[in-house]
C-alpha cells in the first residue's frame, strides 16, 4: 500500500474504509462520480478487486469502477 497522502482508490486494500479527498478526472466524469456518491469526504469501502476493476460500497450501494477511473479518486484511510 502507498502512503496515505498519495493513495488512490485502487490502492485501498479490500475491506478498508477510505474517505475521498479529491477527484482528478475530467469535469464531466467528476460530476458523474459525485452523482454516484463518490464526492469529497464520502466514506467508501473497497469490497473486491480483480481483472483491473474494483467494486466499492458507497451510499449502501455497490459500484464497479475500472482501475483507470479508480486511480483518479484520491483517498485516505477513514478513521
Question: Can you say where each PLM-predicted feature lies in the sequence?
Answer:
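Amphipathic, hydrophobic secondary-structure cores in small proteins
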Residues: 14-70
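Extended boundary segments
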Residues: 1-11, 74-79
Amino acid at each position: 500500500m502507498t502512503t496515505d497522502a498519495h493513495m488512490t482508490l485502487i490502492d485501498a486494500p479490500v475491506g478498508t474504509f477510505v474517505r475521498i479527498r479529491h477527484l482528478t478526472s475530467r469535469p464531466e466524469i467528476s460530476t458523474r462520480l459525485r452523482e454516484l456518491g463518490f464526492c469529497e469526504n464520502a466514506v467508501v469501502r473497497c469490497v473486491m478487486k480483480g481483472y483491473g476493476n474494483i467494486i466499492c460500497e458507497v451510499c449502501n450501494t455497490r459500484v464497479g469502477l475500472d482501475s483507470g477511473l479508480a486511480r483518479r479518486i484520491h483517498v485516505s484511510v477513514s478513521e
